[in-house]
């Protein structure tokens, strides 16, 4: 007994399995598509947040704004070191004068 599906090359068992599994496959395909859509939305949201954080970081931590202040602090530190050395030298001389008198 030859079936119409056998003539087309599809075995009846194969057709039965497909009919049983096809609804699950359709649901799985739909779920995968929904996941892809939500993934795309999440990527867009993450990019928006990343760009916002980059902009905020640039505004808060603009290194050009602080370069002059850092340079001034470094200059003050160097001056302080020189003054400290001079003070030590003067203290040493003073102690020599007091001990020799």
Swiss-Prot record:
Domain of life from the UniProt record: Eukaryota
UniProt entry keywords in alphabetical sequence: Coiled coil, Endosome, Transport
Subunit structure: Component of the biogenesis of lysosome-related organelles complex-1 (BLOC-1).
Family statement drawn from the similarity comment of this UniProt entry: Belongs to the SNAPIN family.
Protein's GO biological process: endosome organization; regulation of protein localization
Source species: Candida glabrata (strain ATCC 2001 / BCRC 20586 / JCM 3761 / NBRC 0622 / NRRL Y-65 / CBS 138)
Gene Ontology cellular-component terms listed: BLOC-1 complex; endosome
Keyword Membrane: no
Name of the molecule in the record: Biogenesis of lysosome-related organelles complex 1 subunit SNN1
Recorded name of the encoding gene: SNN1
The keyword Protein biosynthesis is assigned to this record: no
Any coiled-coil regions, as ranges: 62-100
Compartments where found: Endosome
Function: Component of the biogenesis of lysosome-related organelles complex-1 (BLOC-1), a complex involved in endosomal cargo sorting.
């Amino acid at each position: 007994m030859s079936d119409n599906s056998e003539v087309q090359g599809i075995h009846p068992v194969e057709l039965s399995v497909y009919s049983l599994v096809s609804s699950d496959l359709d649901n799985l395909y739909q779920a995968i598509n929904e996941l892809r859509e939500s993934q795309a939305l999440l990527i867009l949201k993450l990019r928006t947040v990343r760009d916002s954080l980059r902009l905020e970081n640039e505004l808060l931590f603009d290194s050009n704004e602080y370069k002059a202040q850092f340079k001034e602090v470094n200059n003050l530190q160097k001056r302080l070191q020189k003054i400290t050395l001079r003070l030590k030298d003067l203290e040493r001389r003073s102690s020599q004068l007091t001990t020799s008198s």
